[in-house]
Amino acid sequence: MRLFIAINFTTKVKKQLYQIIKYLSKEAIKGNFTKTSNLHLTLAFLGEVSSNRVQDIMKVMNQNAMDRESFEIEIGGLGKFINNGELLYWYGIRENETLTNLQHALIRGLKAYEFSVDDKPFKPHITLGRRCRMNSDFDENKFAKIISPIFMEITTINLMKSEYKEGKLTYTSLGEVKLQG
């Protein structure tokens, strides 16, 4: 199973993010834009994991998240990564020490259980669109200025499974840990 630990967004936040994606997609010649149901914030990517290790992952999540207070994040700031000449657009998360500490604790916990995890510096972001090619008159700075920050209280984290169903990428929650608050 292909697994990751994530923060899932409320329906309200997903609708707000979808409006940004919709506007961005209108400015694109091509691109693969994130479905509303797949919007999330990845905390730890595990990749392919045997189903008999799911309980270990849930144990790590409980040990490192259950006693933490809920907290608020601010979503804002358009950015992009360039990969082979194609763009991946994302919406960032403003610097948040509580979020970063949670992510670092999860990575340490997963490593203690001998999971292979990506430990590149944490750059929290929400993927809006992959393999994008934009209209020549698309002004990223102008676009970035018209989108407002989004705020959300973080009360849970989820273990997510990524799979293709009927040719579509689908994310399913396998377990949830509630934060205090």
List where the protein language model places each region:
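Histidine-dependent nucleotide/RNA phosphoesterase domain, centered on the 2H-phosphoesterase fold
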Residues: 1-181
